[in-house]
Amino acid sequence: MGDFQKVVLAYSGGVDTSACIPYLKNEYGVEEIIAFAADLGQGEELEVVRKKALLAGAKESLVDDLIEPFIHDFAFPAIRANALYEGRYPLSTALARPLIASRLVELAREMEAGAVAHGCTGKGNDQVRFDLAISSLAPHLKILTPAREWSMSRQELISYGEKFGIPAPVSKKSPYSIDLNLLGRSIEAGPLEDPFLAPREEVFQITSSIQESPDTPEEIEIQFEAGNPIAINGVTLDPVSIIKKANALAGRHGFGRIDMIENRVVGIKSREIYEAPGLMLLIKCHQEIESITLSADVLRTKVGIERQWADLVYQGFWFSPLKNALDAFIDRTQLDVNGSVKIQLFKGNATIQGRQSYSNSLYLPDIATYSAEDQYDHKSAEGFIYVWGLANRLWASINRDK
């Protein structure tokens, strides 16, 4: 299928990427495979993953700690954008792909590899995200995609890998396909392919069930500066620690579970389960602090920008000119997004309790109040309403009686 002396493979340790190593060597004639795994805070023993790649036949196996750039450069922009694909999915998995792809391209250049490879199948979104990101960063770099070309079933893939000494990672007791990073978990396949079947509790790992969550509500306060969360309960934290703390707080109370039918890029509807407690909590609070610091017209415009931003990221266009332009709009709005939000966590719910901004609040009590301290000029409303309704009255005077 080609003559590639050296290839850098995006490696996860799963069935597909593990099978890619012997497949690339035997079917593509690749001489050297450098396996690259990204540490995105998934909490797995990545040394095991690294050694597994070597066992499968990789000449070199690398693990890079990308947690800090993942949160600072990808998660925080998503929070500022209130990014929810189809109004529900906070892009916890999608945000990781352009970062992995960019590091893949860097390694290919550093090691003078002739191509890069990934193990994404032809049915999923990740193939699109990887291919678009790689081609945007290195248009002439060859991308090898064996999982789109082989015709093996999942069981055949496992058997294929076992022939080369690769142990099967999926048992009958764990039929799910899972992706995990610091922002959350995505779970699909197995029994979840029946969209009417409730997910078993075993599906969830980082959020408590309603039954097991605390019986007492917990109120917390999250502080924002320029649209970024910077402190929880008065304690200033770095971006990675903010996510970890938010995950622990929201997850303990069972907040952040999502069960949805999702429209994939390739046109397939898919049943997806997500756990993203910290990210969902921070987005909810960020939306609230925006409500008091941004003007009505900016808020209305930003809602449309947010939807388009989430669509672009989901569809693989992280490095597109349009996404960059939307970033510029969002980042400008965030200069005024400063303040704190109080929120109560209890039995799977997160309920806003209050919000304040000392420096940028557009909520003015002297204007909003109905008390004796009201400073709003009520008489001015008459002239405003006359002009505001002028077009309607003109239309009615001409057409109403026809």
UniProtKB/Swiss-Prot annotation:
Q: What is its main location?
A: cytoplasm
Gene Ontology terms, MF aspect: argininosuccinate synthase activity; ATP binding
Q: Identify the EC number(s).
A: 6.3.4.5
Gene Ontology annotations of biological process type? argininosuccinate metabolic process; L-arginine biosynthetic process; urea cycle
What is the uppermost EC class here?
A: ligase
Reaction catalysis annotation: L-citrulline + L-aspartate + ATP = 2-(N(omega)-L-arginino)succinate + AMP + diphosphate + H(+)
> Which Pfam family, just one, is annotated for this protein?
Arginosuc_syn_C
Q: Which UniProt keywords apply?
A: Amino-acid biosynthesis, Arginine biosynthesis, ATP-binding, Cytoplasm, Ligase, Nucleotide-binding
In terms of superkingdom, the source organism counts as Bacteria
Pathway membership: Amino-acid biosynthesis; L-arginine biosynthesis; L-arginine from L-ornithine and carbamoyl phosphate: step 2/3
What does the entry list as the binding residues for L-citrulline?
89, 125, 129, 177, 186, 262, 274
Q: Which GO terms describe its cellular component?
A: cytoplasm
Q: Which PANTHER family match?
A: ARGININOSUCCINATE SYNTHASE (PTHR11587:SF2)
Q: Which family does it belong to?
A: Belongs to the argininosuccinate synthase family. Type 1 subfamily.
Please describe the quaternary structure of this protein. Answer: Homotetramer.
Which named protein is this?
A: Argininosuccinate synthase
**Species of origin:** Prochlorococcus marinus (strain SARG / CCMP1375 / SS120)
Phylogenetic classification of the source organism: Bacteria, Bacillati, Cyanobacteriota, Cyanophyceae, Synechococcales
The gene it comes from is argG
